[in-house]
Amino acid sequence: VVTCKGGTERVLKGIKTVLGELKLNLNEEKTKIVDARKESFNFLGFTIIAKKNPKTGKTFPLIRPSKKAIKHIKGEIKRLTCRKTLAIPKETIIKNLNEVVRGWTGYFYYGNCSRDLTTLKGFLDERVRTYLRRKHCKKSRGYRAYPYKYLYGMLGLYKIPTTAPWTQTAKACGRR
């Protein structure tokens, strides 16, 4: 990603020249010029778009997980909690879920992702409850049988942080 206010063709030509000297080349299919103030673009799993702050009027980059990245993590959660995995002990399922979700969250946590992480947390809770309900043949939706204390306290499910790190105090983040 290269940002510039103008002369994009000249900058792109310069980049190609420098890479050519290093005997490297740009992939033409993946290389594109975008006006980030008007349209979004995806880069390394993030969707980046310029937004205006309604209070100050200043433009800032809004960096969120891409739709493809969210779809992928939800697919992984579904795969780990599907009916085929009912024979596997719940401790193993929770361990595998924690590894996948902790890794994904660690990568995407530093963008403007509070809304996406809140949605993912609700999705994860619901999938784990559904898995446990099917495993133990419960007919209810599972909120009473498997409350938050059970999911996070007893089972040890990873609690997805739903607020961005810069909105928390240093003590709350575990930093000094």
Predicted segment positions?
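Non-catalytic terminal/accessory segments
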Residues: 1-176
